[in-house]
């Protein structure tokens, strides 16, 4: 059982505001040994991407976070969205609630979207015993929202164990618990259609330094120096537009509601709400009301376009010239043996949301057409080539 101090580990971390420090090992604290690492990913996601279903893959990845967050209401824990899955860390004494929530999510993904979700549960102590490091920090991304940062080679080791030692660490495929907090995907929303790039393309990028310590931190700072600033954020007020009908609302309803009258009622209600939002925004534009709607302003800031989980992950809006310069920098760093990297470009960004309240919401962004999943595939190909 986790101690009371251990359980408050993540809640007690003070967030950093300087985004250039996300790779500095000094900002991180070791994950308590009595915690558990939870990893999820969608099996055979490449097939879904080729079928034009990457948004479904994204939705399942976010649903894992939403399900556990709802099941553990009141608990603060780190999580990182990875496109086709998620990484979480939890106190050991709440893991049964998380298992029930993820069992339900896996069953819903299979039944409603035809996607198979892999779930691994690994004790942090086992990862540390293998000689790897698990560390966590917090990054302030807005006045009201922090996100987790993960550091150390233990996260990548856990990911490899999830796939190579699936029989040992996989969550048993048991019948899902019906109803209750374990089956709560409330707050999972997909009301935004794909958001076109403002400049040229939306780029999903994963960069992994090949060396540790200050050398790695300097490499990451060099890359970040080209990509930090409002102009690179993939979501902005000027481009944020609701269109009707929402393209992915049916998938949202299928994930959140049982079949039958409840799902039909949810769809009708949400279609009407989204239509009202569209009409209001159109009226606002005609009346030349320039005051930004508070929620939309918060949305642009509460987006996880920058992440670190042992590798730098970003989704950025770039011009053709910015893309060329960035890729040249990355290619130079790759050929000098300093990094591995993968990227995927698409005309649009995808947004999947977790709404807990008027000022409590986070928005998970990815590039369309495969985004992080295709970037990860390219990075792995680089590693194999070495």
Region locations from a protein language model:
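Regulatory and interdomain segments flanking nucleotide-handling catalytic cores
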Residues: 1-386
